[in-house]
């Protein structure tokens, strides 16, 4: 029988390292709750980034997935994870930097991602995975609360920005619940939150999303400017294009919906 999450880490003399942005979760009930809101189905193929002390890993494995692949860059955790594997042979362990691996490298046709992501690489991983959304069933992620609010933000709100647009064009986004700093060891300085992203059935092309990224970069660089001014250097976007698309050219970047940005991008590419 495996020891408790905290005791398991202690037996291996593992303490959190600040350079890796590590904050351990020892509360198994929280781990179970994260997996529960993911609606993970049996026989799914699952990916977890940064399993660390293995709390979330255990909760995922208890749902009997076909396989769980964990990617861990800190070699101190590998012996601990191998001990979990003795009880769950469907656990695959890869020692690697998650930023150096694409989903296609792992041979997935479909994968469910459940992770407590290190804060310092969370945004980059989310954007990268969204561009591989055709391979993803859903992503249930723990991130900084502020980042989750940006992902889920609606137009004309302070948190709304490029990340909101890109995420919502590719996935249905849902803020599930917040997590207090006291749930971690050591406690971080900020609140966290769980967000679930489920890729849409009709996904925009990568080329179209890339064009949206270019347009939103210009638009939100001057988010208080009128859209006709902030996009004036984006040659294809003339005022008549905005009129044709029924977009008020006196709007600011934060007033346009994700679909507005998609239409502008599509018009430029046509």
From Swiss-Prot:
InterPro entries in the cross-refs: KsgA/Erm, rRNA_Ade_diMease-like_C, rRNA_Ade_Mease_Trfase_CS, rRNA_Ade_methylase_Trfase_N, rRNA_adenine_dimethylase, SAM-dependent_MTases_sf
Name the record gives this protein: Ribosomal RNA small subunit methyltransferase A
Family: Belongs to the class I-like SAM-binding methyltransferase superfamily. rRNA adenine N(6)-methyltransferase family. RsmA subfamily.
Catalyses which reaction(s): adenosine(1518)/adenosine(1519) in 16S rRNA + 4 S-adenosyl-L-methionine = N(6)-dimethyladenosine(1518)/N(6)-dimethyladenosine(1519) in 16S rRNA + 4 S-adenosyl-L-homocysteine + 4 H(+)
Family matches, as Gene3D superfamilies: Ribosomal RNA adenine dimethylase-like, domain 2, Vaccinia Virus protein VP39
Name of the gene this protein is made from: rsmA
Enzyme class: transferase
A GO molecular-function annotation: 16S rRNA (adenine(1518)-N(6)/adenine(1519)-N(6))-dimethyltransferase activity
Location relative to the cell: Cytoplasm
Record key words, sorted: Cytoplasm, Methyltransferase, RNA-binding, rRNA processing, S-adenosyl-L-methionine, Transferase
């Amino acid at each position: 029988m495996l020891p408790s999450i905290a005791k398991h880490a202690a037996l291996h003399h593992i303490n959190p390292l600040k350079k890796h942005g590590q904050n351990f979760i020892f509360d198994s009930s929280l781990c179970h709750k994260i997996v529960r809101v993911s609606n993970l189905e049996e026989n799914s193929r699952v990916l977890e980034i940064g399993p660390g002390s293995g709390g979330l890993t255990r909760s995922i494995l208890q749902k009997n997935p076909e396989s769980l692949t964990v990617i861990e860059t800190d070699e101190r955790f590998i012996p601990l994870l191998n001990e979990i594997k003795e009880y769950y042979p469907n656990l695959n362990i890869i020692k690697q930097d998650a930023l150096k691996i694409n989903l296609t490298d792992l041979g997935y046709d479909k994968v469910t991602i459940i992770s407590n992501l290190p804060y310092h690489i969370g945004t980059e991983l989310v954007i990268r995975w969204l561009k591989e959304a055709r391979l993803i069933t859903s992503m249930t992620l723990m991130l900084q609360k502020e980042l989750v609010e940006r992902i889920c933000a609606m137009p004309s709100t302070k948190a709304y920005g490029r990340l909101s647009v890109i995420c919502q064009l590719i996935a249905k986004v849902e803020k599930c619940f917040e997590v207090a700093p006291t749930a971690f060891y050591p406690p971080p300085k900020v609140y966290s939150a769980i967000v679930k992203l489920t890729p849409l059935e009709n996904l925009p092309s990568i080329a179209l999303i890339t064009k949206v990224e270019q347009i939103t970069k210009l638009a939100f660089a001057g988010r208080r400017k009128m859209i006709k001014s902030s996009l004036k250097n984006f040659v294809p976007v003339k005022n008549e294009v905005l009129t044709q698309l029924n977009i008020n050219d006196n709007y600011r970047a934060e007033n346009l919906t994700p679909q507005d940005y998609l239409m502008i991008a599509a018009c430029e590419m046509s």
